[in-house]
């Protein structure tokens, strides 16, 4: 089913993914790094693709990030993205860096492209070395397909504690040409970006250069991936990469292009969709939480308040317990570090107004409990009545299963 977004000239393709844009193929296989599941994959483009990336701000960064940064820095283009899961190749010293370079070299040889057109990344357990014989033999076996099956195989190959695959696809019109933006992601725990434990790979056939693509991705990341949190931990490895083949043959996109807003909106919706899927699949989670803040001093502060609320363990556990404890919400607002007038705050949980101008409303606890049990996503709305700033953030409830999953992660 296709769904039209009424606020922009954008169409959502419910069955699309990272192979939907012209020029892209994908593959995922099992090599033996994991016991049973697929653990190695690649996205490949027919042509060198303008590329942009945003990386974790964790000061301890895994070796593959350095290699990918170096590749993109040469021409601002990539043609292949190689990913393994199960082992993160983080905190592995010179050997780990050499292994990442080897992955890049073998990928270039396999796909018959220059090394600087290859990016690599890894996700999994920190502090273990990659079994390079297994990895290099696996890379040589990769045979990407320009099919939805190839996209699903790739997505499966990059998952760790995820319970579901995460795909998205949108289309828009630029110069009368159909432009497609598709993507996949992984992420379930250790999610608290400035980029954090997540990988997201987005492809598009739009004609756009590296600089303008990087500018768009950086801005959109701050509004999407950097607005999700599961557990407050920021990873060593993770990144968002966008590759643009240019095969839609539109006139080169710049912010001055008359259809720039169409492309930007499609990319924004794709990233937001993937971000929300990651939050919804938080380890042990039973539902998505969406917090919208209005009336803040500015958009940045609105986003900060929203993320503070959705990241509060007390708020998350209250949602899991179907407890409309708005006191936990206002507490998170107060320690957000943003401008707040404690006498003008409105809070609503779904349609139920719990606080008006910082005074309790005498709402029905039964109605609130029923909403929290049935709603997914659970929506929390806050109006600070300070200014015109607006922002959203996404997260999930916190359950007993989160502890169970993470207590046994390496076993």
UniProtKB/Swiss-Prot annotation:
It is found in: Cytoplasm. The record marks 123-124 as: Involved in the stabilization of negative charge on the oxyanion by the formation of the oxyanion hole. Feedback inhibition by L-ornithine. It catalyses: N(2)-acetyl-L-ornithine + L-glutamate = N-acetyl-L-glutamate + L-ornithine; L-glutamate + acetyl-CoA = N-acetyl-L-glutamate + CoA + H(+). Catalyzes two activities which are involved in the cyclic version of arginine biosynthesis: the synthesis of N-acetylglutamate from glutamate and acetyl-CoA as the acetyl donor, and of ornithine by transacetylation between N(2)-acetylornithine and glutamate. Belongs to the ArgJ family. This is Arginine biosynthesis bifunctional protein ArgJ. It comes from Halalkalibacterium halodurans (strain ATCC BAA-125 / DSM 18197 / FERM 7344 / JCM 9153 / C-125) (Bacillus halodurans).
């Amino acid at each position: 089913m296709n769904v039209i977004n009424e606020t922009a000239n954008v169409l959502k393709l419910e069955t699309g993914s990272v192979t939907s844009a012209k020029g892209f193929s994908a593959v995922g296989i099992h090599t033996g790094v994991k016991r049973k599941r697929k653990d190695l994959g690649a996205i490949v483009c027919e042509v060198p693709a303008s590329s942009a990336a945003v990386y974790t701000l964790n000061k301890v960064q895994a070796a593959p990030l350095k290699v990918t940064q170096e590749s993109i820095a040469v021409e601002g283009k990539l043609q292949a993205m190689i990913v393994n899961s199960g082992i993160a190749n983080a905190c592995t010293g010179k050997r780990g860096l050499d292994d990442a370079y080897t992955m890049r070299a073998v990928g270039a040889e396999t796909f018959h492209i220059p090394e600087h057109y290859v990016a690599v990344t890894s996700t999994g357990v920190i502090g273990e070395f990659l079994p390079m014989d297994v990895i290099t033999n696996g890379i040589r076996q990769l045979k990407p397909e320009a099919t939805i099956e190839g996209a699903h195989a790739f997505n499966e190959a990059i998952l760790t504690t995820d319970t579901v695959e995460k795909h998205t696809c949108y289309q828009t019109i630029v110069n009368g040409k159909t432009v497609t933006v598709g993507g996949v992601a992984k992420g379930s725990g250790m999610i608290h970006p400035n980029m954090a434990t997540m990988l997201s790979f987005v492809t598009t056939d739009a004609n756009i250069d590296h600089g303008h693509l990087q500018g768009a991705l950086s801005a959109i990341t701050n509004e999407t991936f950097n607005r999700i949190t599961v557990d407050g931990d920021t990873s060593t490895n993770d990144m968002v990469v966008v590759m643009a083949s240019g095969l839609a043959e539109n006139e080169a996109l710049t912010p001055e292009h008359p259809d720039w807003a169409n492309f930007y909106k499609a990319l924004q919706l794709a990233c937001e969709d993937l971000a929300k899927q990651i939050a919804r699949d938080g380890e042990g989670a039973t539902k998505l939480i969406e917090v919208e803040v209005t009336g803040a001093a500015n958009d940045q502060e609105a986003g900060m308040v929203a993320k503070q609320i959705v990241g509060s363990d007390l708020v998350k556990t209250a949602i899991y317990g179907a407890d409309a404890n708005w006191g936990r919400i206002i507490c998170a607002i107060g320690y957000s570090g943003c401008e707040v007038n404690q006498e003008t705050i409105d809070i609503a949980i779904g349609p139920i107004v719990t606080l008006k101008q910082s005074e309790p409303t005498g709402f029905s606890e039964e109605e609130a409990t029923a909403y929290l049990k049935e709603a997914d996503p659970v929506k929390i709305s806050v109006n600070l009545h300070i200014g015109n700033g607006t922002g959203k953030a996404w997260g999930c409830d916190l359950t007993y299963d989160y502890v169970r999953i993470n207590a046994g992660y390496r076993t």
